[in-house]
Design a protein with these regions (language model features):
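Electrostatically charged, flexible surface regions
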Residues: 160-278
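Phosphate/ribose-phosphate-bearing ligand recognition and processing surfaces
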Residues: 138-166, 170, 177
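A cross-family phosphate/adenosyl-ligand binding-site feature
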Residues: 2-5, 24-101, 105
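Short glycine-rich anion-binding loops that position phosphate/pyrophosphate groups of nucleotides
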Residues: 15, 43, 90-91, 114-117, ...
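Internal, conserved structured core segments that host functional sites
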Residues: 97, 103-152
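Short beta-strand segments
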Residues: 12, 38-39, 111-114, 146-147, ...
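Short, glycine-rich nucleotide/cofactor-binding loops
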Residues: 12-18, 123-125
Length: 278
């Protein structure tokens, strides 16, 4: 799918429509296209691919079944906002609404800019930012997820802190037409270094497959520990040089060109099980 040189851009996020990251992107993207914002009305971080499907039912027995079309519907409330539409829903709700219900149809969806990096294959089904981009890709609309590393950056974030990430994103959108990028790629996952660091170039990366979560029981309660963030804080990571996490720690802008999952792998063991069942 070739991107238009003057694209209609759908902008969403998971930090909420009043977050500084989406404001910075809105300002920067207006220079390269027409921007429509459809974003959650509050912080919806780490909700992954979840939808509000069924959440607004008036009772457990109200399935909102449309008998004529044999499809389920679920209202997703919204209010008007100075940037666009503030949706009482998830980032994926916003992507679906923006792609299918808002005119004109978007040429590209941009999700972000997230306060905090989204690195590694494991985050794709967890991060609301990346999930919105994936949702758009499943809806056959090119998309970009944009996040900024904030580890160790202890100031209250303002739109100005995201200006560098926003300008980089606008440059990518502006440079895409004529390249055939979205004929071969469904979406990009872009991660930008901390705002107090000048980017040390760009790196085309693959999402790291390293995943180290731990769980313990202390004083009768469960605790989760993300060892990956501990490693990043210590700048001691096991990832190879071609990965997104390595690039960001080196101060580079990480760009991962991705296709939507999921691929079918070795089917022979499954076939063996079926033969045993039959």
């Amino acid at each position: 799918m070739e991107l238009d040189s003057d694209p209609h851009i759908l902008l969403t996020n998971d930090d909420g429509i009043d977050a500084p990251g989406i404001r910075a992107l809105y300002d920067a993207l207006q220079a390269v296209g027409t921007v429509t914002v459809v974003a959650p009305d509050r912080n919806r971080s780490a909700v992954g691919r979840s939808l509000s499907y069924g959440r607004t039912r008036s009772s457990p027995d109200d399935l909102s079944l449309d008998l004529e079309s044999d499809s389920f519907t679920s209202p997703v409330p919204h209010t008007d906002h100075e940037l666009g539409y503030a949706v009482d829903g998830t980032p994926c709700d916003c992507a679906i609404v923006g792609v299918n219900a808002i005119e004109p149809d978007p040429d590209i969806v941009v999700s972000g800019c997230n306060a905090g990096a989204n690195l590694g294959a494991y985050v794709f089904s967890r991060s609301g930012t990346v999930s919105a981009a994936m949702e758009a890709a499943f809806l056959e609309t090119p998309s970009i997820a944009v996040s900024m590393d904030t580890l160790g950056y202890d100031t209250d974030l303002e739109p100005s802190d995201f200006e560098q990430a926003a300008e980089i994103t606008a440059t990518i959108v502006d440079g895409a037409p004529g390249t055939g990028l979205f004929d071969r790629v469904d979406y990009l996952n872009v991660n930008v270094p901390c705002p107090d660091r000048e980017p040390n170039g760009y790196a085309i990366t693959r999402p790291t497959r390293v995943y180290e979560m731990d769980a313990t029981v202390e004083d009768g309660g469960f605790q989760l520990t993300n060892k990956l963030w501990q490693q990043m804080a210590n700048r001691d990571i096991p990832d190879s040089e071609d990965t997104d996490r390595h690039a960001v720690l080196e101060g580079q802008v990480s760009i991962s060109p991705l296709r939507i999952p999921y691929e079918v792998v070795d089917t022979d063991p499954v076939r063996t099980i079926i033969e045993r069942i039959l």
